[in-house]
């Protein structure tokens, strides 16, 4: 039986939030962010670093590059949209919902030794929710947290390790 499962929303009311803040999961998220902060303390920007980037970090970089390069394929509509441009929805559906499954699966098909295709089920929603909400066409801190959760999952799976944290933070 797989230990991976599709994430679901669990915070609807204030009591849910209070329960989450007291949970092990919340502590793990905060600890992961602290580890990243400590990993970059006193270090130069990764763009200028002479250290080599690990294969897993290079794979994540390629995933992000693929995601952002696809923006060119979906230029904004020339309309007066008060709440965001609807071409974002098309980009989100094609690049994140459809293509991201294949792209995230590629993370585990490299020579990194971690070949867990079942993890895609859990990782995919965190990744595509990192880039905003296609229904509301919005972006906020919850979406940023989704990217942290995507990275945290990779870290807990041991796809990423402590040496990768400084690159994540810069």
Regions from the PLM with identified roles:
Residues 1-129, 134-148, 168-170:
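N-terminal leader regions that mediate targeting or early regulatory function
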Residues 160-170:
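Alpha-helical bundle/repeat cores within regulatory domains of eukaryotic proteins
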């Amino acid at each position: 039986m797989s230990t991976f499962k599709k994430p679901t929303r669990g915070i609807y009311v204030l009591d849910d939030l209070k329960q989450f803040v007291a949970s092990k999961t919340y502590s793990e998220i905060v600890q992961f962010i602290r580890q990243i902060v400590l990993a970059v303390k006193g270090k130069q920007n990764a763009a200028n670093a002479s250290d080599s980037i690990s294969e897993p970090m290079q794979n994540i970089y390629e995933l992000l590059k693929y995601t952002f390069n696809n923006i060119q394929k979906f230029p904004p509509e020339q309309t007066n949209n008060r709440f965001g441009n609807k071409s974002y929805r098309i980009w989100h559906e094609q690049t994140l919902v459809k293509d991201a499954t294949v792209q995230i699966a590629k993370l585990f098909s490299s020579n990194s030794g971690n070949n867990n295709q079942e993890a895609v089920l859990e990782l995919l929603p965190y990744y595509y929710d990192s880039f905003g909400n296609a229904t509301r066409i919005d972006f906020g801190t919850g979406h940023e947290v989704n990217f942290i959760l995507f990275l945290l999952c990779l870290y807990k799976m041991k796809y990423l390790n402590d040496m990768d944290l400084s690159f994540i933070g810069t």
